[in-house]
Structure formats: structure tokens, C-alpha cells
């Protein structure tokens, strides 16, 4: 809920990013960030929920930025760096986006692990623990992640409950955040 107090205008968002994330960023870099992470509700997180869950004008924008800068950009950077050096698998949860007001939230991907309704991750965790491979007879085919083929097991509410997708969402924004992290390490 901290996002409610961070910013209510585009200028406040950019001031917050500059003050707390990139105090040495150029105006051009901040303008690029402003373009890649717009305040348009339909383009914010949780994604693919339209204007739902837009508690404030900047809420979904800040959620998209924070999700990418804290989770997706570092994850993708390390998965690409380790590609071809060790076995990798990735997953994306698109479950629980219908939670009123907030949509999916940090940690919501863990609920299905302990649910009777979904067993994919639970079974995959057991297979991985025993075999260093999440694939098994009760898990949908889960191809390895590589830089050339960044496959992810994507989890959905409803049917189908899973699908294999590519880890190519928001590529330009995630790559830009990675370049900022390298240039301005925290």
C-alpha cells in the first residue's frame, strides 16, 4: 500500500524514481523510463486487467515499475547469463488477477502450491528436489529456459491451467532497467 503515497502525478513518479533509485540518471534516461512505464492504467500491473485495480492514477504504473525492477529484470538477467551453463526453468503465474482492488499480489503465486485445486508446482517441486528436473508424469511438459528459447511454464486460473509461453514480455522496459542497474548499482 506504500504505492498509494509515492506519487499521484507523472512528475512525482519521476521525482521518486530519481530520488530513490537513480539520483545520477540523466534527464534523457528518466524520459525513456517515463515512456516505457506510462501512467496509462491498462498498461500497468497487474497486467491484462485493463483499468481494474487502478487505486490511484499512478498505482499500476508504480506496480509495473517495481515488479520489473525488483523481480523481472534481475531474474531475466541472471537466467540469460546462466543460459547454457546450467539447467534452468522459469515460470510465470497469471493466477488470482481477479482479487478485488489489488489484483494478484506478491506471494499470490504460492497459494496454489498449497491448494487442492492446483498441483503443478507442488509436484514440480517434489520432482525437482529428487531429480534436479521439475518434469514428471503429473507435471505438464516444462521445457528448459535458454536465451535462445526463453520458455516459461505459465499458470492460469481456469482451463487450461498451464501453457508454455516465451519470456519476452516488456522486453524493452526490462532491458532498459537492467542497463540502469548496471550503470547505477544500488
Give a label for each model feature.
Residues 83-86, 120-186:
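Alpha/beta-hydrolase-fold serine-hydrolase catalytic core, especially in secreted/extracellular enzymes
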Residues 1-118:
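Substrate-gating cap/lid region and adjacent catalytic-acid/histidine neighborhood
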Amino acid at each position: 500500500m506504500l504505492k498509494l503515497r509515492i506519487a499521484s502525478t507523472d512528475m512525482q513518479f519521476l521525482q521518486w524514481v530519481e530520488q530513490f533509485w537513480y539520483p545520477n540518471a540523466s534527464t534523457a534516461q528518466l524520459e525513456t523510463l517515463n515512456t516505457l512505464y506510462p501512467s496509462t492504467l491498462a498498461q500497468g500491473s497487474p497486467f491484462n486487467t485493463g483499468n481494474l485495480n487502478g487505486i490511484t492514477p499512478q498505482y499500476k504504473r508504480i506496480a509495473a515499475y517495481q515488479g520489473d525492477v525488483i523481480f523481472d529484470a534481475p531474474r531475466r538477467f541472471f537466467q540469460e547469463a546462466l543460459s547454457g551453463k546450467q539447467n534452468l526453468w522459469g515460470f510465470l503465474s497469471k493466477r488470482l488477477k481477479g482479487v478485488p482492488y489489488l489484483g494478484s499480489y506478491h506471494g499470490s503465486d504460492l497459494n496454489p502450491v498449497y491448494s487442492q485445486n492446483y498441483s503443478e508446482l507442488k509436484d514440480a517441486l517434489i520432482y525437482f528436489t529428487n531429480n534436479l528436473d521439475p518434469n514428471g508424469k503429473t507435471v505438464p511438459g516444462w521445457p528448459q529456459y535458454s536465451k535462445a528459447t526463453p520458455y516459461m511454464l505459465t499458470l492460469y486460473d481456469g482451463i487450461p491451467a498451464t501453457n508454455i509461453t516465451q519470456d519476452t514480455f516488456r522486453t524493452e522496459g526490462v532491458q532498459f532497467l537492467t542497463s540502469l542497474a548496471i550503470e547505477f548499482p544500488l
